[in-house]
């Protein structure tokens, strides 16, 4: 706060740029307005600007009604004045054209350009520009409202010639030797660079930069002192030769400083805004019965109320009658609608029956046609088969008859049922006869073998013993007894033989023996 007050005490021209630029957008400060004297001798030192009117007043201004001698209490321009484009003494007679030009174009805005505020502002502006000093004295302190405008940029967008060196060497060159200038035919110009391919100039520039970096690195390596190469079998190793701990002998000067700032004060409450009173208060007294006579004024009101009441009653009665008529019509319509719905249902049912009958008859007719087609197909197939098989059936029947497919049932029954039984019975009887024959043959064979054995034994004995043997007491001459003794082993031997056909050979052998 102290620094701000110091800069505020200095003239506007001697303030720094950042202090001069901190102004509100309206162009006026918030400090209290203090009337300035019109005496040029009262200006502070170093202020060479046209902030005050000349002693003789202004000459020829339509906005200020000619040469006014009234001292203005506040300067219209709060920032440092620039050289005016015109020598007109009116402070409202100049307007800045642009931020890039220091000169001001001489213009003059009429009073309606400055009257953008309320009626009080207009009165104050008229009092400020009134040439009569009594009016200004009667109004006392006045306020000034300027035309809103954008804040001027204090920083220049282009450097001044002061900041540039005075003697700057000028570089000259022939533009025809510039690589960016193309010489030759316009139709033989090189085509544009294909997207995706690097620029040859850029590649050349990168290669040159890479070569320069390699050359610089090679030169640095050559200039840098090197340690001799180690002998064979050894290698260089970095070793710490400096001290690990270093004593800090420098004493740092320490100074203690302290600063106490003022405590923050609470923001005072904002005062209420009370606008200035612009109108006049006027009072009028009206006594009772002067403006309103009840007996006279109540008649139209009663007429309106009674008329509206009767009209509303009539409307309600008409509405009730209309509702009754609507209900009667609705009932009649409901009856007609029910009758029509019943008729519609009857017609729908009739249509449904007709449709079902139609579908049934169509199905029946389709079945008849289908059966007729099947019958025709069968008849045609039968006729075709008869015609085709007329010459084929006799030969087929003959072959089947010859093959045994067509036979006499009685003959087949005899062949299948009777003949096999007869053959079995014959075979059984033959088997029994064969068994009897076999038994008989075996008995005869046994007897013959015994006799042969006896005969051979007799021939081998001396002559005196032959009679004893033949006529001895133990000699059995009855053949039946011999047969009874030998019947059992013969029967056992016959039962062990399987078939009579196999016994033919022994029978034949027995026959031969018997023949012998």
Swiss-Prot record:
Post-translational modification Phosphothreonine, affected residues: 270
Stored InterPro entries: Radial_spoke_3
Main location (coarse class): cytoplasm
Pfam family, one: Radial_spoke_3
Region Disordered: start-end pairs: 1-45, 120-139, 190-233, 459-516
Record key words, sorted: Cell projection, Cilium, Coiled coil, Cytoplasm, Cytoskeleton, Flagellum, Phosphoprotein
UniProt keyword Phosphoprotein present: yes
Coiled coil: 333-369
Polar residues: compositionally biased ranges: 120-129, 465-486
Source species, domain of life: Eukaryota
Subcellular location field: Cytoplasm, Cytoskeleton, Cilium axoneme; Cytoplasm, Cytoskeleton, Flagellum axoneme
Positions with biased composition (Basic and acidic residues): 218-233, 502-516
Span of the signal peptide: none
One cellular component term from this protein's GO annotations in UniProt: radial spoke head
Biased composition (Basic residues): 12-25, 208-217
Keyword Cytoplasm: yes
Role description: May function as part of axonemal radial spoke complexes that play an important part in the motility of sperm and cilia. Functions as a protein kinase A-anchoring protein that scaffolds the cAMP-dependent protein kinase holoenzyme. May serve as a point of convergence for MAPK and PKA signaling in cilia.
Subunit structure: May be a component of axonemal radial spokes. Interacts with IQUB. Interacts with phosphorylated MAPK1. Interacts with MEK1. Interacts with PKA regulatory subunits PRKAR1A and PRKAR1B. Interacts with RSPH1. Interacts with RSPH4A. Interacts with RSPH6A. Interacts with RSPH9. Interacts with CFAP61. Interacts with LRRC23.
Record family assignment: Belongs to the flagellar radial spoke RSP3 family.
Name of protein: Radial spoke head protein 3 homolog A
Organism: Mus musculus
